[in-house]
C-alpha cells in the first residue's frame, strides 16, 4: 500500500512538472484567485485558468495548422487540375504528379503534427481539470462546518466530478472545435477573396443568419441547463443518501417507499432532460436546414458565374468545397452552443464553492506552538443558523489543564455544541472561549488542532489499511509507539486474528469491520497523536461491555496529564472523571465530582436514578 502511494505521488509530481507553471502561490490558490478576479464572467474565468499554459496552446495551434494543411490545400489542387484539363494545358500531367506528391507529403505530415498537437493540448486541459478539482478539495477543507452541514454531500460531489468534467469538455470544445472552425473559415475566406470578391461577399451573407439563430436560442439554453444542473445535483445527493440508508430502509421494510421517493426524483430529472433534449434538437435541426439551403444557393450562384465566364469551371468545386466548409463550421458553432452553455453553467457552479466566503479564516491569527489545556467558557451564547433559539445560554465553565471533564445532560442540551466550540468548529455568538487564556476566535486553529485529538460519536475510517487509519496524518511513527497504542485501544487480539494484521484493508468507511472494531481504531488514531486535549464524543458507545471496560482503563491511564472532554449518555462510564458538568437549557446547571453531584441529589442524581 505504501509503495503504491509513493508511486502515485511520484506520478503526480511528474505530471505537475510538465503542466504546472512556476507561480508564487500554490496551484489551488491560484485557481481560486482566477475565479475571484473574474466573478460574473465565466468565459473570461475559463481563459484565465489557462493563462499559465498559453505557450502550450500556441504550440498546439501551430501543430494544428500544419496537420490540417492537407485538407485546406486539396480543394485548390482539385480546382487547378480541373482547370488544367478543361483548358488543355500541355503541362497537365506534370502538374498532376506535382500536386499528388505535395498532397501526399502534407498527409504524412499530419501524423507527427497530430501527436504533438494532442500532447500540447492535453497537458494544458488536464492541468486545468486537475487544478480545478484540487482547488475544490482545498476549498472544501477550508469551508466552515456549518457550510458542510447545510450543503448535501452529493451536491458537492457532483461539482467536483460532473461539473469539472463539463468544464474540461467545454475547454476541449472551445480549443479543438472553435480553433478548427476559426482556421477553416479563415483559410476558406482568404482563398475566396483572393480569387473572387463577388463570391466572398456571398459567403458573408451567411453570417447574419448564424448570428440570429444563435441569439434566439442562447437564453433558452442557459435557463434549461441551469434547471437541469440543479436537478442533477439534487438527485446525486438523494442517491448518496439512499445508498447510505439501505440498512435502515431494509430493516424497517421501507424498500417500496424509498423506491417510490427516488422514482419521483428520477422522473423530475427525466422531464427536465426531455425539455433540454427538445430545445437542443430544435436548435440543431433549424440551423442545419437553414445552412443547407444556402449551400444549394451557392451551387446555383457559382454555376451561373461560370456560365458567364467570371470564374473557371474548376473554381465551382473550389467554392462549393469552401462554402460547404464555411456552412458546416458555422453550423458547428450552432451545434456546439448546448455544450458551451452546459460548460458555462458548470463554471458558474464551481464558482459557487470557490467563491464562498463561509470559510474558517486563520490568516494573520496567533499561532500556538504549545498548549497546556486550560479552558474557560465566559458567558458563552450560541445558536445555529436559521434557528433563533440559543443552544447555549450564558454558559460559564472553567476547566483546569489535565482535567477530565464529563458533559452530561438530556439530548439537545448543548453537549455536542460545547465540544464543537472546543474543537473550533463553532464560534461563540457572544462571550468568549479561552484556551490557555487566549481567545480561541483569535488564534490559528490549524496550529491549535495539532495538539488536539477527536473520537467522534460515529466512527469514521478512511479507505485503506488498519495501519493507514491509525497513523493517519502522523509521520515516522515507530513500531513501538504503534504497538503501545494498539494495546491501549484493545486492538491486539483483533489484529492478531487477521491474516494480514495491520495491513488488512478496512473497506469503504470501514465496512469490513464491526462497529466496535471501527470505534477502537478511531480511538487508537486519536491516542497516537499524543495530544494535549482529547475530545471523546461517546467514544465507548459502540463497544461491548468487556471491550468498554478495557478501553476505559486504558483511557484513564492515557488521559492523565491531558485535558479531556467526554460526552456520554451512560453515566457509569464517567465515574472516574475529575469533574462532571450537567448541561441543562444551555447552561452548566451542576458542576463537581461524581460523589459531590450524587450527594447533591440534583439533576445528575435524577439522571442516574433513571438509568439505574
Language model features: what each stretch is:
Residues 140, 262, 350, 377-379:
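Conserved catalytic Walker-motif region of ABC-type ATPase nucleotide-binding domains
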Residues 51-52, 145-146, 162-171, 175, ...:
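An intracellular "coupling" helix at the cytosolic face of ABC transporter transmembrane type-1 domains
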Residues 1-71, 86-99, 117-121, 125, ...:
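Membrane-integrated ABC transporters
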Residues 57-113, 193-198, 309-313:
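Transmembrane helix-loop-helix hairpins at lipid-water interfaces of multipass membrane proteins
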Residues 359-370:
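Pre-NBD coupling/linker segments of ABC/ABC-like ATPases
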Residues 369-612:
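ABC-type nucleotide-binding domain
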